[in-house]
From Swiss-Prot:
Alphabetized HAMAP family for the sequence: RNase_Y
Domain KH residue range list: 211-274
InterPro entries assigned: HD/PDEase_dom, HD_domain, HDIG_dom, KH_dom, KH_dom_type_1, KH_dom_type_1_sf, Ribonuclease_Y, RNase_Y_N
GO BP term, pick one: mRNA catabolic process
Name of the protein described by the UniProt record: Ribonuclease Y
Region (Disordered): 105-124
Gene Ontology cellular component list: plasma membrane
Gene that encodes the chain: rny
Membrane protein topology class: Single-pass membrane protein
Organism expressing this protein natively: Halalkalibacterium halodurans (strain ATCC BAA-125 / DSM 18197 / FERM 7344 / JCM 9153 / C-125)
Residue intervals passing through the bilayer: 5-25
Biological role stated in the UniProt entry: Endoribonuclease that initiates mRNA decay.
Family of the protein in this entry: Belongs to the RNase Y family.
Length: 521
């Protein structure tokens, strides 16, 4: 830095000396020119005097004019040079002042930097001293802590690590629980969406199958011919078909009563043919019953084939198709089993499509899930066991066999399709109008449901809705708070499970409402 200041000072001195020397040189040149001009003028004058005395005055004037011009020009040039030199001197002075100020600033900065460096050095020494003191104190504290706790440093580290691991394990468990709960919630939501979509897309009938059939007669005189002499005709018909004929005051009608729909259909077909033919006697009755039995067997096969065609299911064994057709004449709680099986197959296929599963396999499993009901009155065992035996005998797919075995929860479901079939079975059976119960039983169940709910303290009103599948309980807010509302719901649910028989599930909803009313006057 000192070298730069010295160099700038020398440069300024050299510039000033050069300016002065230039000025002196220019002044000497100007004076030389003036002297030369004067000498030339004198020479001219002398020459003029010698050459022409006549024009002496004019020559003298001309010379004087020339001398005056030369002098004027020389003086002007001198003034310009002098002004220029003065300007250069002024600029040099300004630059010198600027350099002086910069030099002072640099000196001040250098002095400030020196002070700061000295201060930083001092602080660094202080920090180093403090670090050494802190390290000494920490070492003493560590020794004291080890003495008090009875743990060495490594042992304490292991204890802390174990505590941290335990805490992290707890937090991880909570996180996993939260994620699992969220996953279940999302799965339930998705399941509800799939079930809702399947139900909306499924158009099913409201069935009401009965255990009696009615045969219309052309007139009441036909009743006597059906009974026959000493009742031989009616006895023959009842013996051959196993169906009771009820002939009462109902005009122009005979009622066929029996719990086997196939036998009832055979009796109905045979009786209609006898009435149409008009020849009614035991031999003719036996002939018509045999013919009706063959026709019903053929109709059963056609029902099975038509069902598989409508559902788009191929490759079923012919015997299995015939057994499937028998479901047309079977009912469960008033619901036609074949229609129920078709409905289950359709629902299972819709839900399988939503989940990306095999739709045809799901429909096949749904259609055959109740196949055992076709012959459960002829073979020992539950319809589930019989269905599994039939499916195994006719070499059905393992998924179909598992769906039949698990649709009532008797066996664990090993595939998604089995779970879908069970869900579709519950949907088909639980939908409004699918199955029938007596009005008296239904009303008694609803009354019992409301009675159980109203037996608890704090209950204000109780409403059984959705055909007894939900009960809504209004409680008194000044007696039952939010915490007791949850407990009340659990207690009512437990009592319903203990005292009431019901199909499916019953939803218990406890509603606590607080109203604040004021009047503006």
């Amino acid at each position: 830095m000192e070298f730069n200041v010295l160099f700038i000072s020398i440069l300024l001195v050299v510039s000033a000396v050069s300016a002065v020397v230039g000025y002196l040189v220019r002044k000497s040149i100007a004076e030389a020119k003036i002297s030369s001009a004067e000498h030339a003028a004198k020479q001219i004058v002398e020459d003029a005097k010698r050459e022409a005395e006549a024009g002496k005055k004019e020559a003298i004037l001309e010379v004087k004019d020339e001398v005056h011009k030369l002098r004027t020009e020389a003086e002007r040039e001198i003034r310009e040079r002098r002004n220029e030199i003065q300007k250069q001197e002024n600029r040099l002075v300004q630059k010198e002042e600027i350099l002086d100020r910069k030099s002072e600033t640099l000196d001040k900065k250098e002095e400030s930097l020196d002070k700061r460096e000295e201060s930083l050095t001092k602080k660094q020494r202080q920090i180093e001293e403090m670090d050494s003191k802190v390290e000494e104190i920490l070492n003493k504290q560590q020794v004291e802590l080890e003495r008090i706790s009875g743990f060495s440093r490594e042992e304490a580290r292991e204890v802390i690590r174990a505590e941290v691991e335990q805490e992290m394990a707890h937090e991880t468990a909570l996180l996993i629980k939260e994620r699992v709960a969220k996953a279940k919630e999302e799965a339930d939501k998705k399941a509800r969406e799939i079930l809702s979509l399947a139900i909306q897309r499924c158009s099913a009938d409201h069935v009401a199958e009965t255990t009696v059939s009615v045969v219309n007669l052309p007139n009441d005189e036909m009743k006597g011919r059906i009974i026959g002499r000493e009742g031989r005709n009616i006895r023959a018909l009842e013996t051959l078909t196993g169906i009771d004929l009820i002939i009462d005051d109902t005009p122009e009608a005979v009622i066929l009563s029996g719990f086997d729909p196939i036998r009832r259909e055979i009796a109905r077909t045979a009786l209609e043919k006898l009435v149409q033919d008009g020849r009614i006697h035991p031999a003719r009755i036996e002939e018509m019953v045999d013919k009706a039995r063959r026709e019903v067997d053929e109709a059963i096969r056609e029902y099975g084939e038509q069902t598989t065609f409508e559902m788009g299911i191929h490759g079923l064994h012919p015997d299995l198709i015939k057994i499937l057709g028998r479901l047309k004449f079977r009912t469960s709680y008033g619901q036609n089993v074949l229609k129920h099986s078709m409905e289950v197959a359709y629902l299972a296929g819709l839900m399988a499509a939503e989940l990306g599963e095999d739709v045809k396999l799901a429909r096949r499993a749904g259609l055959l899930h109740d196949i055992g009901k076709a012959i459960d009155h002829e073979v020992e065992g539950s319809h589930v066991e019989i269905g599994v035996e039939l499916a195994t005998k006719y070499k059905e797919h393992p998924v179909v066999i598992n769906a039949i075995a698990s649709h009532h929860g008797d066996t664990e479901a090993t595939s998604i399709i089995s779970s879908l079939v069970a869900a579709a079975d519950a949907l088909s059976a639980a939908r409004p109008g699918a199955r029938r119960e007596t009005l008296e039983t239904y009303i008694r169940r609803l009354e019992k449901l409301e009675e159980i709910s109203e037996s608890f303290d704090g209950v204000e009103k109780t409403y059984a809705i959705q055909a007894g599948r939900e009960v809504r309980i209004m409680v008194k807010p000044d007696i039952v708070d939010d915490v007791l509302a949850h407990k009340l719901a659990r207690d009512i649910t437990k009592k319903i499970e203990e005292e009431l028989d019901y199909p499916g599930h019953i939803r218990v909803t406890v509603i606590r409402e607080t109203r604040a009313v004021e009047y503006a006057k």
